[in-house]
């Protein structure tokens, strides 16, 4: 490959949006290209990802190189880490090639003609320039970590494949002090990655619930803070939970106490009514006869000369009033059974009459002699007694009243001794 063809990695965010444009490079140079191609398909988190674009331009004017970490964060040359000479490994220099296509097979098996033919000296010179850049260690750590957090929080869900590999990839780039700047959230993710391969939890659900139900904010915050993914002390969370439980139980106790007090007041009123009734019965004996007569007449009873009968009448009236008032208070008011039974009997009688009329009509129409049917068509009178006997011979026993109602319904002329 000529020296005019160069390698450039753009810093625009559109370059890293498509998965087909991302390539994973195994850091081995001194091997056959076929062996490199066979081992080139690796996990995204285990090595750097570099976007290579070839074009014909001045080779000396292009000194820009961008590394891409496992989560898709771009860092320019002036933001990269200052790698120490002890940590810099000349054997693990990446094999750079510039074969790009929409097809995945083209990416995994690049053409040898398009592969970049740069020796170790050129790569060492580029890495030495990156190494000599000042004040880039902390810049890379903060930019790599915080931009990752921003991209994740904007999508609403935090998803990462094996966070412990993310830490390894950062250490390959020289980020050994990431432990100091890492929040407890990433620590929890790294610890949970040992048991589960994928870690996923929602960030925006709490905000949505608080917007829908503002009154439930305190309970939501207490429950969310008790999760292992969020920051805080477990003891304080338990304390908040117990406080919420105490508040709930106190409110519930107050409601129950109010209902009990109301029920007690209701029972007191009933007891007072019973005591008043008993006191009235005791006072009836001391009432004069004229007053007892007035009370009995007020209830609609006839007056009597004997005081004992008047007392019994008044007592029975008072007992009836007390029982009725208690049944109303308890919701056991006596239903009007006689109305229900009467309506049921009426409906049953109507059904019987209609069924009997239908049976008579079927027998008349299906008879072989057609004597009754001919009389009906010629408007000749039918003897009711003879018609009743004729129906009995057809296995239909019907009373005279039902026969008369059938004749009245269908306009059949009748004759008989009942006139």
From Swiss-Prot:
Regions crossing the membrane: none
PTM annotation, UniProt: Phosphorylated in response to DNA damage.
UniProt key word Nucleus: yes
Entry superkingdom: Eukaryota
Single GO BP term: nuclear DNA replication
Principal place of residence: nucleus
Keywords, sorted A to Z: DNA damage, DNA recombination, DNA repair, Nucleus, Phosphoprotein
InterPro entries the record matches: Structure-sp_endonuc_su_Slx4
Subcellular location: Nucleus, Nucleolus
Entry GO terms, CC: nucleus; rDNA protrusion; Slx1-Slx4 complex
Family, per entry: Belongs to the SLX4 family.
Reported function: Regulatory subunit of the slx1-slx4 structure-specific endonuclease that resolves DNA secondary structures generated during DNA repair and recombination. Has endonuclease activity towards branched DNA substrates, introducing single-strand cuts in duplex DNA close to junctions with ss-DNA. Has a preference for stem-loop (SL) and splayed arm Y structures. Introduces a single-strand cut in duplex DNA on the 3' side of a double-strand/single-strand junction with respect to the single-strand moving 3' to 5' away from the junction.
Complex and partners: Forms a heterodimer with slx1.
Note: Simultaneous elimination of slx4 and rqh1 is lethal.
Record-given protein name: Structure-specific endonuclease subunit slx4
